[in-house]
Amino acid sequence: MKEVTKMLYCALLVTKVIYQMKGKSQPKRERKKQNYWVLKSLWKRPQRQAIMSKLYSKRLPNRCLNFKTASQLLWIAKMQIVQTKINRESLIFLQQRSRNKALVSVST
């Protein structure tokens, strides 16, 4: 899960750079709001607030990143999160199943 969080954090940094490049003509407050909604749609967890505060406090990397690499990073991060969720759910399911089997074998 740590790797996934790191990957998502990188992806968020990249999107922040891109959204700042795209929204240069907008006032800063408006850009922040836009970034906030982008981040919110990506990261619906309690850690979101911490990540966002880190994003706004960090210095941005050089603006040599393009939209394609950012979208790829985001896609990978999203897939990783989906995968970990699936793995966790299947693990819980298997645990419940084995518990049920144990109960059945004990009762017979």
From Swiss-Prot:
Organism of derivation: Saccharomyces cerevisiae (strain ATCC 204508 / S288c) (Baker's yeast)
Protein's name in the database: Uncharacterized protein VPS63
Gene disruption phenotype: Deletion causes a vacuolar protein sorting defect.
Top-rank taxon: Eukaryota
Gene Ontology BP annotations: protein targeting to vacuole
